[in-house]
Amino acid sequence: IIARSLNEIAKKMCAKGKGILAADESTGTIAKRFKSINVENIEKNRLNFRQTLFNSSAMKDFIGGVILFDETIRQKTTLGPSIPELISKHGAVPGIKVDKGAKPLAGSSDETVTEGLDGLRERLKEYYELGARFTKWRAVYKISDKFPSAQSIKSNAHALARYAALVQEAKMVPIVEPEVLMDGSHNIDKCYQVTTNVLNECYNELEIHKVDLKGTVLKPNMIIPCLLYTSPSPRDRQ
């Protein structure tokens, strides 16, 4: 029953013609956006901005899910319902980013591993009670002559799988986001090779951790040459 429910949520999030809205800007990030339009960065203004966004007519037609920030999922609208209730009213699924960010990977000079597993089971229980029905966790990989290392690929895949298993245990759908960054000087073939290795390792770990893939959503990077690559091959131009 739980597996069927998770699959239905995942399908609703990714319904044809709809996308997932990333509205999980941190307080610091939204401050920069407000500054550009001379709006004070206070909770009232942040609530009004998001409430206006989630009340728009486009929500029903184009949005299948909304990723929220911790502050936002706890807020109530000026009309009474909570933000998650408002999102659900418009036919979208409320979700929450749960990772704690990419931190330096011990044993590697310039790579990261995403943290946030400590206390995650308890946080997931609270987020479910607040109305979340899916979550997001992002791992990042950089490409260079030395990177990503096997250590980085394995460490991040293991963390993603542990996260996904905990999320499904909490009756929510995990978005699995292993992102190979565009930074560097690599071509499209290198991006393809690294992304393939990263995804293979992620799905190996998901299987080991008994994650039901039908109750997950994959958020992959695009296969493209990096930002600094200057000698495109015929394949790069396609």
Give each language-model segment a name.
Residues 42, 137, 176, 218:
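Conserved, mostly hydrophobic/aromatic
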Residues 123-130, 134, 163, 169-170, ...:
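Alpha/beta enzyme core
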Residues 129-149:
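A glycine-rich phosphate/pyrophosphate-binding beta-strand-loop-alpha-helix module
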Residues 1-130, 143, 231:
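Alpha/beta catalytic barrel-like cores
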Residues 41, 112-119, 148-159, 186-198, ...:
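Alpha-helix N-cap and loop-to-helix initiation/capping positions
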Residues 25-27, 70-72, 100-102, 139-145, ...:
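Active-site-proximal loop/turn and secondary-structure-junction residues that shape catalytic pockets
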Residues 229-238:
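Conserved small/polar residues in nucleotide/adenosyl-binding loops
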